[in-house]
Design a protein with these regions (language model features):
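Boundary at the C-terminal end of the N-terminal hydrophobic targeting segment
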Residues: 17-19
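N-terminal accessory beta-strand-rich subdomains and adjacent acidic, glycine-rich linkers
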Residues: 22-272
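An acidic-aromatic substrate-binding cleft motif
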Residues: 248, 252-305
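Sec-dependent N-terminal signal peptides
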Residues: 4-13
Length: 305
């Protein structure tokens, strides 16, 4: 009887652990914490110290045949701690970069995973898929909610065709209306308590850039240009899109998707020093890099070379 009771208790504990709905991830210092909740969708909260910065943020990925992140069924949880030194081929800020983070990989039924990394200066996440053949990506879901009414520093183009040269506008998240123009990345948010949250992306391959809009409910949602199919002439060094697909990308079914990363700091200088984009980039695949030298570049059309 005692053995039966003990076996039942062990089974209950095992099922509870595997059926866990909330998964916690902390940065190496423990100051930044991400709480990932699995309900009918994938949600996460972000805390720095004792202050919650973002809550009820929703992520997902829609293909022509799959709704990844809707009613997620967890298969496996993999955790990893990494501490390594990176050496840039052409140093831009530092000759060596410390890459230290804790990782949470959630593998779901249906051939997809979501990977979170927590650094001492921010966090990042991305989707990974293990699907057959080519996939049509219809949309990537991101609903971002700041807890406080933050001051946003935005570049707002007239459309998806942009040279990223628009002047920055400064308005609170409550002032940014759904009818206003969308914003491009990076986006910088200043909290009332002086923290800075910079959102951007890295490792874009065979995939469009992310833009942001107000969702009409006080949050921020992702927007993407559709896949161009036909182009026409538009001036001496530009093309205009004549026809678009009904998807945002056609890409390999087995791949990793762009990183969505967030720098968190209370010191503006750390924004300039930050190297998250480099730390999250793919490893260099060029075997011989001796020919790569930093130097000057010529902009022919501008200086009439």
């Amino acid at each position: 009887m005692k053995k039966q009771f003990l076996l039942s208790a062990v089974l209950c504990l095992s099922l509870t652990a595997f059926g866990q709905k909330v998964h916690q991830l902390a940065s190496p210092s423990g100051n930044i914490r991400i709480s990932v909740e699995l309900t009918d969708q994938i949600q996460y909260d972000v805390t720095q110290g004792n202050q919650t910065l973002m809550d009820n943020c929703v992520i997902g990925l829609e293909t022509a045949n799959h709704q990844l992140g809707i009613h997620p069924k967890l298969n496996k949880v993999v955790r990893q701690n990494v501490n390594e030194e990176l050496t840039p081929i052409v140093p831009l800020k530092f000759s060596t970069i410390t890459n230290r983070y804790n990782q949470l990989l959630l593998k779901f039924k249906g051939g997809y995973s979501v990977e979170f990394r927590a650094f001492d200066d921010g966090f990042a996440y991305r989707f990974l898929t293990d699907l057959k053949g080519e996939q049509e990506i219809m949309n990537e879901i991101l609903r971002l909610n700041f807890v406080d009414d933050c001051l946003l520093h935005l570049q707002q183009p007239d459309g998806f065709k942009t040279s990223y040269e628009e002047e920055y506008r400064h308005q609170t998240s409550s002032e940014w209306k759904n009818s206003n123009r969308m914003a491009l990345l990076p986006l910088l948010a200043s909290t009332p308590k002086g923290d800075k949250i910079l959102m951007s992306e890295t490792n874009l391959t065979d995939y469009p850039a992310m833009f942001l809009k107000n969702d009409g409910q006080g949050g921020i949602t992702a927007v993407f240009p559709r896949l161009p199919l036909e182009f026409g002439e538009d001036g001496d060094r530009s093309l205009k899109i004549l026809k678009e697909a009904n998807c945002i990308a056609r890409t390999a079914g087995k791949r990793s998707y762009p990183w969505r990363y967030f720098v968190i700091t209370d010191d503006d200088r750390k924004l300039i020093e930050n190297t998250l984009s480099y730390r999250l980039a793919e490893k260099n695949v060029i075997e011989n890099t001796s020919w790569i030298k930093p130097g000057l570049a010529s902009w022919e059309w501008r200086n009439a070379a």
